[in-house]
């Protein structure tokens, strides 16, 4: 980005930078934290600033529950014999079938393996259903098993919402509101809500600012 700006200045080209709706922060929101005179940037400091600015899980200027993070509660092993929540994937359609056959016919020797079934939602309706399914079946235990790994299980209690946010099927501001509404209405455990929101308003926005 800096090289683009510098080159445009050199060529006397006027630059207009637009805010990206795929992120919560505007460009000017990031400039105060990611200053050029700072040598190090810490995600924890950024995250606290985000919580205060967005008034997310705050009681005045104090974090709800008395702690900024509950990461120490989010490292449990998945219990032996516990059955993970059922995942309902989108139904395969004609377009996906055509794409699947095309890739197999023309790139059969390439690395990787393409799934015969659709994994991710591909429109706004399916994205909304996917979010609601996460809230109802996986959100409550998202926190404790956030770092858990089980052989032959790829999702467990994760949301798998990142691809949908990254391509604009779910707006991050709407996502934060949906998470908070469900948290308060259904008495979801605090470490699950905080741990999830830290990924959205903390890590995701922080890494964007770093880049």
Indicate residue ranges for each PLM-predicted region.
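Catalytic cores of enzymes that engage adenine nucleotides and/or redox cofactors via long glycine-rich
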Residues: 73-211
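Beta-rich, aromatic/charged-enriched effector core domains that present basic-aromatic interfaces
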Residues: 1-119
